[in-house]
Amino acid sequence: MHTLITRRILLLAAVLVVFSSSLVVAQGTTEWLTLGGDYAHTRSTLADEITAENFAELDVAWEWDGASFGAVSGRSTPSLIDGKLYTVAGNKRYVIALDPKTGETIWSYREPDTPRGEYSMRADYGKGVGYAKIDGRGVIYIISPGFFLTALDAETGVPIEGFGRPVPIDGFPQTGVVDLLADLGHPYDPYEGLPLETGYITSSSPPLVVNDVIIVGNSAEQGYHQSRIENVPGDILAYDARTGALKWKFNVIPQPGEYGHETWENDAWEWTGDVSSWAPLSADPENNLVFIPTNSATIDYYGGFRPGDNLYGASIIALDTRTGERAWHFQMVHHEVWNFDNPTAPVLLDLNMPGRGSVPAVMQVTKQSWVYAFDRITGEPLWPIVERPVPASIVPGEVLSPTQPHVTKPAPYDIQGITIDDLADFTPEIRRQAIEALADYQMGPLFNPPIHAGNSTGKFAAMNCPGGGG
């Protein structure tokens, strides 16, 4: 398995060996500087040496075996920077620099072991590294499963002198590290982490460095595995890229006096949480904006204990990178109970629109088969997004929003909702089997509500299409 999975990383590296001179991304360079290739998260290149005609002629130049670093899932997108390839691997989230010509390991860095890192549910989910050039020196930034931010010299892998603050744990470097838990404002033990009865937080996506500001998202316990309704909010943190000093914190669950606080009834804002940003971030450096795609509030399929729309759950938030002030936001799903969290970074592009000319846009692809499109400066939808009635819940104590936002354009890219007419009918026998297989399930529209055991319909469960996996 290790060989197969690491090959996904390494074949990309091998292609970069041959064609790196033609890699051009949105920053106007020949490099791949961020997880998405560029700040706009286009994951695209203007390179034209690889074509449909010559693709079959590509050969593997080398392979790098990540098994020695505990690589299992292989979720990382390598970065190509200043002639080196940077990636992360394994449950320990090693940071590794490779020679793209030979595949040889130049250096590696591993954070010392801690219980808070060991029990991280997203330990092997590392997606990549952050990068910035600070005062002429390349710096690699990494967020560990234990939720530490480390700054490393891109040439040597040595923690940056003068960055961060000492961590009171044996084995940690005395410089180069920031304990991110310290800035969330909850009691915790530096070694053990947050008490499990308080909540859980970690990270899988790398930080994004915009105009010398490190912006840190986070990940909570997976909503479909949550065992408690108590949790901590996944607040967005930002740090000075030179010193590691905290610059600002944005509360993803609004506190008293903040915009949106009234969307949390039952005082749930005090003791529940999530609304994290496990998906990557994107940014518009010219306009000092970072775009945050958020997760649902705690527990994916039931929210009776948190009545209200629950801002900023299942939203896109545009923040000023300098201050953390909210420029605008849009909530895709009110009081989310379908696992319809935003699963990927917003994509930035400029659209030529009739009567409007070139419009700076941001697009959020979602699990519910819609692409939400906005003016990225003002937050105005580029096409109408209308509130339409949706079914109510029959689950005791659950009060869903009576309406949900519906995108009118672009058209959905996949089926939304499911009826008996959508079932397979290749032959009469296949159709009969399909109907029988789903007889105990409640079919319905896109926002078909979850149901509970022993419900009055006699159905075993409700079906969602698309489901929580998109």
Where are these regions (language model features)?
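Repeat-blade elements of multi-bladed beta-propeller folds
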Residues: 32-36, 71-94, 120-148, 199-228, ...
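Extracytoplasmic/lumenal domain signature
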Residues: 53-67, 95-119, 135-136, 149-197, ...
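PEST-like low-complexity, intrinsically disordered acidic/proline/serine-rich tracts
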Residues: 86, 359, 412-470
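Bacterial N-terminal signal peptides
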Residues: 11-22
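A surface-exposed, glycine/aromatic-enriched loop/edge motif typical of exported proteins
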Residues: 235, 392-423
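Bacterial N-terminal signal peptides that target proteins for export
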Residues: 2-12
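Mature N-terminal segment immediately following signal peptide/propeptide cleavage
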Residues: 27-69, 80
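Conserved oxyanion/phosphate-binding beta-strand-loop segments in alpha/beta enzyme cores
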Residues: 46, 51, 282-286, 438-442
